[in-house]
């Protein structure tokens, strides 16, 4: 099959109407009406959705924890592929505009809509079960239905335990929508979420998900993450005097943001390759870009998740007329002599234990690192002190409770690259179907107060209306035609990604030219263990790794993507910065890099990020 001429059809099937009504006598009233044996035939497609006549009828229900909600009677349906071709589909629960338009209250006024954050669900399709909130994404399931296959599904819904009194009298009206295409190699789910290496956590770390209102403790074995849906695994650490309390708490317990000290995102080990025409390599158009890839609007980076026994060393390039090949496993997943199953990335730019201090911390190692949203990032600190602050997190007697099972450190440049490449894959914002065109680029943080997690609500640009236009959790539900203004600043376009990788402050990374210390505070030449920094031997990014291209470092491979800065380190400016700052124009972005005019010394616009490498 010619992948360039694959036919795609948008199929909307009114198989489910979901009504949730809050009232003084009934917190939750849910009735799901299905249309029995709905069949849609378009060209080679022949899909049949079958469902029993009885639906769910929940009356006089109260907001409940997930454990209780999962005991509700399921609504059952099936999806049958009667055609001779395999189909890839995504199943979304979206607003039923027709039902909303016809909805009136007993007084005759239009119905007020219930916030999607108030609706929790569990969906089972075949042998897959996933629990989530309608605020996570409108997509509730995805997959491949093989030719002549029937997949049975079950859906349970309940009211979020955190629903407040303001929900009284409001309604939610929804319908299921199916998007389907002929199955091609672009949708190889054998390389998807099932192959993700399970996050390696220390005993002090708590797995979390966002319920639409707050971060809550989650079950590590049931729906914690789903990389196919842009839900990357998140974990936190809390204050020492709160740890035992949260460890003993039930699944679904809200984590008070004041108790959180660090937040982390798991980047699983993967291999990648980049498509091109033999001269330029801007990624592939694939299923997620509506134009041919260019430097200004690059395409998809092919990614496949691999075990830590796999270390591929191909060219990381292939012709876009062929199947993906020449895979390369990023150097970020090697720490010294250890091959890692993944790495934990600080979710936000680093802040300090005294964010009200000058520059959010200043040039000292006396403060401790925090990683959380809505605080001032730690700036005006030289690279030597950044290095020491990174080591402190997992050092003996640290305040966070980390053991020797973890190795904390300042982010290397290749580790930045690992996050950037995953964001440009189908598992990151590039693959998030709620964003199209130029909105595929990670939104810029234009906060002139350097507040972590902020979003301008659009990619980097020359606008000078600085500030924190949207906080990181703004509009966490994205619907057709409406982009998530806050979550668009994350690497996934969901709340589960990494923030502050475009704008905010420049981020120092441990990338250096020929061991030159300059103003960093290190002695010269550098005597650091090589596992803590990347050494570059040439100011030409295509020759910087001992005369060769630095594959996986997001340097020459992705130079100028999204028109981001691309200035390499040199003898004059030996230390590397990433991401851009709040007042950078179009040059700010996840692929942006620059040689630091501060020479590794303190800068009022320079912050840093932290990484945790498991050594279990």
Short names for language-model regions:
Residues 19-20, 29, 67-128:
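Surface-exposed interaction patch
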Residues 254-261, 291-501, 614:
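Short aromatic-cysteine micro-motif
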Residues 414-417, 438, 444, 448-466, ...:
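C-terminal, surface-exposed recognition/capping segments
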Residues 185-325:
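N-terminal module-boundary/linker segments of secreted carbohydrate-active enzymes
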Residues 3-4, 61-67, 125-152, 156-158:
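Extracellular adhesion/glycan-binding regions together with long Ser/Thr-
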Residues 71-88, 92-98, 139-184:
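C-terminal, structured domain-capping segment
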Residues 2-67, 170-172, 177-184:
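Short, polar/proline-rich extracytoplasmic segments that appear immediately after membrane translocation
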Residues 74-76, 171-175, 205, 259-269, ...:
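Extracellular structured ligand-interaction cores
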């Amino acid at each position: 099959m010619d992948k360039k001429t694959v036919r795609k059809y948008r199929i909307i099937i009114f198989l489910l109407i979901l009504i949730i009504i809050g009232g003084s006598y009934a917190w939750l009233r849910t009735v799901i009406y299905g249309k029995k044996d709905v069949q849609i035939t378009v060209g080679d497609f022949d899909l049949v959705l079958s469902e029993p006549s009885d639906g769910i009828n929940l009356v006089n229900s109260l907001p409940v924890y997930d454990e209780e909600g999962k005991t509700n009677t399921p609504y059952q349906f099936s999806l049958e592929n009667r055609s001779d071709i395999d189909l890839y589909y995504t199943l979304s629960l979206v607003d039923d505009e027709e039902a909303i338009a016809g909805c009136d209250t007993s007084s005759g006024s239009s119905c007020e809509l219930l916030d999607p954050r108030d609706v929790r669900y569990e969906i089972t399709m075949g042998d897959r079960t996933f629990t989530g909130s309608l605020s996570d994404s409108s997509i509730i399931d995805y997959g491949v239905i093989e030719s002549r296959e029937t997949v049975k599904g079950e859906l349970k819904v309940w009211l979020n335990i955190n629903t407040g009194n303001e929900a009284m009298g409001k309604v939610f009206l929804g319908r299921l929508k199916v998007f389907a295409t002929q199955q091609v190699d672009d949708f190889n789910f054998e390389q998807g979420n099932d192959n993700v290496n399970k996050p390696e956590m220390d005993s002090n770390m708590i797995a979390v998900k966002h319920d639409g209102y707050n971060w809550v403790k989650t079950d590590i074995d049931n729906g914690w993450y789903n990389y196919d849906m842009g839900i990357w695994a998140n974990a936190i650490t809390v204050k020492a005097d709160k740890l035992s309390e949260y460890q003993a708490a039930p699944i679904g317990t809200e984590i008070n943001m004041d108790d959180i000290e660090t937040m982390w995102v798991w980047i699983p080990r993967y291999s990648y390759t980049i498509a091109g025409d033999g001269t330029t390599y801007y990624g592939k158009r694939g299923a997620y870009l509506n134009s041919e890839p260019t430097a200004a609007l690059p395409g998809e980076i092919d990614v496949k998740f691999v075990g830590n026994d796999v270390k591929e060393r191909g060219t990381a390039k292939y012709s876009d007329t062929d199947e993906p090949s020449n895979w390369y496993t990023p150097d970020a997943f090697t720490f010294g002599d250890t091959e890692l199953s993944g790495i934990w990335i600080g979710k936000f730019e680093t802040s300090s234990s005294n964010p009200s201090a000058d520059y959010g911390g200043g040039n000292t190692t006396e403060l401790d690192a925090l990683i959380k949203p809505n605080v001032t990032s730690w700036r005006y600190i030289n690279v030597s002190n950044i290095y020491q602050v990174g080591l402190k997190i997992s050092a003996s007697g640290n305040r966070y409770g980390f053991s020797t099972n973890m190795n904390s450190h300042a982010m290397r440049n290749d580790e930045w690259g690992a996050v950037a490449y995953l964001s440009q894959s189908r598992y990151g914002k590039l693959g998030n179907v709620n964003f199209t065109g130029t909105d595929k680029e990670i939104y810029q943080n234009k906060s002139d107060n350097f507040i972590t997690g902020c979003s301008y609500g659009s990619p980097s640009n020359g606008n000078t209306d600085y500030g924190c236009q949207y906080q990181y959790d703004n509009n966490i539900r994205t619907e057709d035609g409406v982009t998530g203004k806050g979550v668009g600043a994350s690497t996934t376009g969901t709340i589960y990604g990494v923030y502050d990788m475009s704008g905010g402050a420049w981020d120092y990374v441990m990338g250096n030219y020929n061991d030159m210390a300059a103003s960093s505070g290190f002695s010269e030449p550098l005597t650091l263990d090589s596992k803590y920094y990347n050494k570059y031997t040439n100011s030409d990014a295509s020759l910087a790794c001992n005369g060769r291209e630095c594959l996986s470092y997001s340097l020459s491979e992705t130079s100028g993507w999204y028109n981001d800065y691309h200035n390499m380190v040199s003898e004059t400016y030996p230390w590397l910065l990433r991401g851009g700052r709040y007042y950078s124009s179009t040059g700010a972005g996840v692929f942006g890099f620059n040689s630091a005019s501060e020479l590794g010394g303190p800068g009022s616009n320079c912050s840093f990020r932290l990484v945790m490498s498991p050594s279990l």
